[in-house]
Amino acid sequence: MSDSIAFPNLGIYLPHVIKSFTVFGYEIAVYGITMALGILAGMYMAVYVAKKTGQDEDDYMNLNLIGIFTGLICARAYYVIFSWDYYRLHPLEILDFRGGGLALYGSVIGAVSTAVIYALVKKLKPALMLDTACTGLVLGQVIGRWGNFFNREAFGGYTDNLLAMRLPLSAVRADEVTGLMMEKAEEIGGETFIQVHPTFLYESLWNLGVLMLLLLMTKNKFKKADGEIFLWYLLLYGIGRFWIEGLRTDQLLVWGTDIAVSQLLAAVLAVGSGLLILLIRFVFTGAGRRRKS
């Protein structure tokens, strides 16, 4: 039962959820496979949207190939920087990607930076490229979050809501377990189980909704200017991440504070992008229409 995962209020019980398997003597983490699937799906989505909007698909294939490396490096760097108290004592683990430790906001920063630089070098429109690339980015997040499911990580505090997830205490890190979890813990077959918010699932479902809205905006020519779809991504993802991050028990904190860095970043990006959307909708494009009339 030590590798089981259950959603008791949904009547779902998974007796054996593996973290890794071995091929020719080499251990392969399911987390890594999940991330790879997310990357591949995101690549396809960006190329698909580029084709539908009359852009050169090759530009997005090239961008994707570069973005894989920059996204992974930035995702790892973000996690290591805000977990430095641990990694300064275990420096050899900094380059070990197999067990997790990738921060999605880091991957966003890496992917966005890569898209802007690539567009400038190729003399393309950075804002248009961000509008297209963000659809692939959010699909990658929808799938990639399931890596946390297999790793039994990135969960929230105790809950008994409909989606509550039950995990063996022995399968999670001790520093992610709260007092309330232990108060509500159950003994089943000699094993101690805790019940938590499946925040990975919340974020995956939230991002799926964001993706659907972005695709509708793209299809219906909703945007008033290049870059607006990307701003809507930052706004909607930021709102969801701010809420979900507040539930988690493994938050990366701003040094010397109790402030969750991803929650702070989500708030800043959501507010900033929301203001820019208002400016695009009611100031910049409005002024342009008045001048034409």
Which sequence ranges carry the predicted segments?
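A feature for loop-to-transmembrane-helix boundaries and adjacent hydrophobic helices
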Residues: 1-293
